[in-house]
Regions:
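Conformationally flexible catalytic loops at phosphate/diphosphate-handling active centers
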Residues: 227
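Short, mixed-charge aromatic SLiMs
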Residues: 393-406
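Short, basic/glycine-rich phosphate-binding loops at helix/coil junctions
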Residues: 64-72
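A structural motif shared across PLP-dependent enzymes of the aminotransferase-like
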Residues: 55-63
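Flavin (primarily FAD) cofactor-binding/catalytic cores of flavoenzymes
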Residues: 2-56, 72-211, 216-217, 231-388, ...
Length: 455
């Protein structure tokens, strides 16, 4: 049987795990990567500008949760590896499974246009045009930095956390009064680093609301190593979780931080092993949300003002697909991507797959590895989704479950519970296999350009 040929955009962990799965199933593919090597967000100083790695970064997911199913992490790894170890793990994976020869580096997909009869016309940065039967989008969602637009002007230096590398680069923060805006993982890491007394003269953190901060260790073990079972009701998980956190670390106001306005699983929690210590030690000072910029300082929503030299905006990212010109395939003005079945398939577009487009707790690293099981089974005729009408109903139910519990915010549009998702995906694959068998196991995407050559 001739298989459809797939174009994969991106050679980060979502792209190369998808490639590995397609290779296992004998499905031809090409991967196009804008940078000169693999790794995406985890490639420090990535020349494509899409990495948010800073020099001191350690992943906040333990090695047990981020490991790929068929390629264990090294036994001598620490619980929370440095980004350089993770990148080496990615390189070892790609080389072990012979994927590098399928990746074209320094080549950006400039345009991906769906053809009326199906399939995709792919225009590359080299000017070359190729045709593919299917498209897998794995361009990541942590690269299009979002900076809020506040009134006023600021005379000092300001950067998004995406650009932060060290206390000296790209802005020298030594001896400066620094404001970090945000309370996400990057905000807490950067604030903790800069708040050390030999670095910033004074460190402020601005946040519109409080968040739940989870410890990295519980009982001497990584907190995510033994998660609650996926079947546990959400309300019970929240009740137990809040009780454990309060018993282990107390309340956020105990450290001079604002009390969270929402329950533990109603907002995106933050994992930090250092921020609470810095806050409790007086090394950083909390401020409410920013009201306006004011020359050499910032005015906050409570009317207070602080003189600052540097602002680090740790204010998140927008979801973007610059190669799509059709708005039906892009995120809307509220940062919501198109409705996707199992976060992968767009009803009515059977030859398009979104890979890794989620904010799964606790990990994104091996998320697309799970999704790729459905994609490979689908392209080889071993899986068939339900009719479009049912797909739409399931999409709504899934989104109500995964994002409905969170307060409305741009950062919460792609939230997801990893373990619950994987369990549901396993069941869906079994149902889809039965549907495919009843339909004669015919691949839903028929090969039109098996060589993926210019037409």
């Amino acid at each position: 049987m001739v298989m459809p040929k797939v174009c994969i955009i991106g050679a980060g962990c979502s792209g190369f795990t998808t490639a590995k799965r397609l290779k296992d199933h004998g499905i031809p593919f090409d991967v196009f990567e804008a940078s000169d090597d693999i790794g995406g967000n985890w490639y420090f100083n990535n020349p494509n500008g899409m990495s948010a790695c800073y020099q001191s970064l350690h992943i906040d997911t333990s090695k047990w949760r981020l490991a790929f199913e068929d390629y264990p992490v090294p036994a001598d790894w620490p619980d929370y590896p440095h980004h350089s170890l993770l990148l080496q793990y990615f390189h070892d994976y790609v080389d072990h499974f012979g994927l590098r020869e399928h990746i074209t580096f320094n080549t950006r997909v400039e345009n991906a246009a769906r053809l009326p009869e199906g399939g995709w016309r792919i225009t590359l940065s080299t000017g070359e045009v190729r045709h593919y039967d299917a498209l897998a989008v794995a361009n990541g969602h942590h690269w299009a930095a979002r900076i809020p637009d506040y009134p006023g002007h600021f005379d000092g230096a300001q950067i998004h956390s995406h650009l932060y590398r060290t206390p000296f680069e790209p802005v020298n923060c030594i001896g400066k009064r620094v404001l970090v805006v945000g309370l996400g993982n990057s905000a807490m890491d950067i604030a903790s680093e800069l708040s050390q007394r030999p670095i910033a003269e004074k460190l402020f953190v601005s946040a519109r609301r409080g968040v739940w901060i989870f410890p990295k260790y519980i009982g001497g073990k990584p907190g995510d190593k033994n998660p609650d079972p996926a079947w546990m009701p959400r309300w019970l998980r929240q009740k137990i979780g809040e009780r454990i956190i309060r018993k282990l670390i107390g309340t956020m106001p105990d450290y001079g931080l604002p009390e969270p306005e929402y329950g533990m699983f109603q907002s995106h929690g933050t994992v930090s092993g250092e921020f609470l210590v810095r806050a409790g030690s007086g090394d950083l000072t909390m401020r409410p949300g920013v009201e306006r910029l004011d020359g050499d300082g910032v005015v906050f929503t409570d009317g207070s003002r602080e003189q600052v030299d540097v602002i680090v905006w740790a204010t998140g990212y927008d979801i973007r697909f610059p190669f799509f010109k059709d708005p039906a395939f892009t995120a809307d003005s509220d940062n919501r991507p198109p409705p996707l079945y199992k976060r992968i398939l767009k009803p009515g577009t059977p030859d398009l797959f979104y890979m890794g487009l989620a904010q799964p707790l606790p990990t994104l690293v091996n998320f697309a590895e799970q999704q790729s099981k459905l994609v490979a089974a689908y392209l080889s005729g071993q899986y068939l989704p339900p009719p479009p009408a049912k797909m739409e109903r399931v999409i709504k139910a899934d989104e109500d479950y995964y994002t409905g519990q969170y307060y409305a915010a741009r950062r919460h549009t792609i939230q997801l519970d990893f373990d619950h998702y994987v369990l549901a995906l396993k069941k869906e694959l079994a149902h889809g296999a039965k549907r495919a068998k009843a339909a004669g196991n015919a691949p839903p995407v028929q090969p039109r350009a098996p060589e993926g050559i210019a037409a």
